[in-house]
Amino acid sequence: MRESIEIKEFTRIFCKDDVQDEGLTTVSRALFEDLEQFLFDFNSSNIHSDASEFMSLGSQRYVGKYISVNNFVGVIQTPKGHQVQILPKIDLGRDENDADEVNSFTQTKKIFLKMIRTLRDIPIKHLDTTNLKTEKLPIFEIFISMYLQEAMILAKRGLKSAYQEHEDNLRFYKGKLMVSEHIRQNIAHKERFYMRYDEYDLNRPENRLIKSTLLKLMSLSMNEQNQKEIRQILTFFELVEPSSNYEKDFSLVKKDRTVKDYEMILQWSKVFLFNQSFSTFTGKSQSWALRFPMETVFESYVAQELRKVCSDTSWTITVQDREKWLFDYPNNKFRLKPDIVIRKEDGSQIILDTKWKSLTDNERMNYGISQSDMYQMYAYSKKYTRTGGDSPDVWLLYPVNSEMRKYTDDRIIEFISKNADENDVHVRLFFVDLKEIGQSMQTLKSRLENNYS
């Protein structure tokens, strides 16, 4: 029987047979051994990748082996079809310790779905999740449900037909006679004609691709309701053949008003059929992993929400700014790309860089801030300083956690580098509350308005 579990990033997974501590996250021996096989498959199939970047095998004293989920959010399917859903470790507020585990996962899932909607290349921005029972569905099943929601809307509106070219050996004359093939096949069959002809039917590339996606999702989904809905939707595609060549059919997709209703679902189909955003594995194994780059997700979410609260200002907000280079000679080298640059009417600038990392309240350990990140902020400050002007304010934005929540009030962590030219470098930290993102961005806006200089 295939298993499905839901955990949060940085969780250690133990084999249930090896531990007695109920406070640990445990799975069956079958699933644990399958996860070990997954790690082996990944390292064998991806010679340029290291599975330890997102999962690793370790041992805890007096307990035994564990598999650690590192900085990784998404879905894993193991060689035997088990699924592990990994959600981001999001601080849900002061009451998180009082909340039950199910409620914690439900809230985290809702926040995560809001976050990934802001990604440019993920085709889910306009899909409605209000009717989905997300508290009962693993994250991957939610994506499948969203696809099925779009497919059902399309099917009920009516699938589009189109003229399709066919070749067949017929008993009647229809279309154009293919002379050479007719001679080759019908020397002994004078009653037949090998014809090329057009027919107006549903078997167009767009419908073939959707049917192929539905069939693939049927094999992947472990949810009874999703399976039921797939079977229902497939009844609309009875006269449609599955695609035998995905790339060819996508190249034949029409780009006109007649298929406007297909745009969103075909983007989804491409993700599932080509495993876009998936890390796939070769060989006999059926392993795959859907991995979300949380640095990118966090940056995208913060940028969108900051734009919303700053819409009443005259500020210009640029994401992934590409204006400056670290070296000007020869011919501009090493482009700088701060996550967010704010330019005010008076010419002053603010640099914001997002980091998906959980800091600790330990000044002696620099709060866990990476030294390379600080070098990067120093370079931003120097290169974005206006000629004859002041250095820009530089902010590092981290997700808040229970340890650093006290810094969401008026307390600021600040680093200052004194310079002879009096253009000191100021780097300040801000902790983003993902549960209360609107309020958090309002607080950030107030701090940016005050300049803190």
Give each language-model segment a name.
Residues 1-46, 286-453:
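Catalytic core segments in nucleotide and nucleic-acid processing enzymes
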Residues 2-282, 287-288:
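Residue(s) in the substrate-gating loop at a strand-loop-helix junction
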